[in-house]
Amino acid sequence: MKPVRALTLSSVLAALSVLLLFLGSFFDVTDLAAVIVASFFVTLVMVECRGAWPWLLYISVSALSFLLLPGRFVSVEYALFGGIWPILKYWLEKLPRLPSFLLKLLVGNALAFFAAWLGLKFFGLEVPGALWLRIAAVVLWEAVLILYDFLITRLIVLWCVKYRARFRRLFR
């Protein structure tokens, strides 16, 4: 893709990402959903533009969300997980299947625990008191991480098979 078109696509998707994160910051339930949808935009730029464009999108949305959003935790979720995950996924999937899967779990858990630690220390999140709730949260996170990784893969396939030709015809 030509640099001007890549810049245009990245800019529009950055604006949409910040808008989604803004809307997601109003309710505690919608923040993770907004982060996931915004991360799909990074995936789209990863597929279409390659190079430094996904990094620029990730950095610009992270910076703008920290500057503009009223709730800071959604910015932390995006910066530490949602925005960086499609880029990390691309590089980790160049490895063989089993090491790739294990490294994705390790990196995903490290990012999640770091985000949770920041939430506990700086954003006033509360930890449930019962040990079984903590264990259930970790198990649920593992399931969400695997499902999220699978959905990104399916989204890439869907984009390449069904929508990419239409998109390219639109931006000739």
Regions found by a protein language model. Give the residues of each.
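Hydrophobic transmembrane alpha-helices
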Residues: 1-53
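Hydrophobic alpha-helical transmembrane segments
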Residues: 7-11, 33, 55-59, 75-76, ...
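Interfacial aromatic-anchored transmembrane helix boundaries in multi-pass membrane proteins
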Residues: 22-31, 62-91
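Membrane-helix interface "capping/anchor" motifs
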Residues: 45-56, 93-99
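Mid-bilayer segments of alpha-helical transmembrane spans in multi-pass integral membrane proteins
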Residues: 71, 106-122, 142-150
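Short helix-perturbing small/polar motifs within transmembrane alpha-helices
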Residues: 78-117
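Membrane-interface helix termini and inter-helical loops of multi-pass transporters
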Residues: 120-133
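Alpha-helical transmembrane segments and their cytosolic interface
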Residues: 134-172
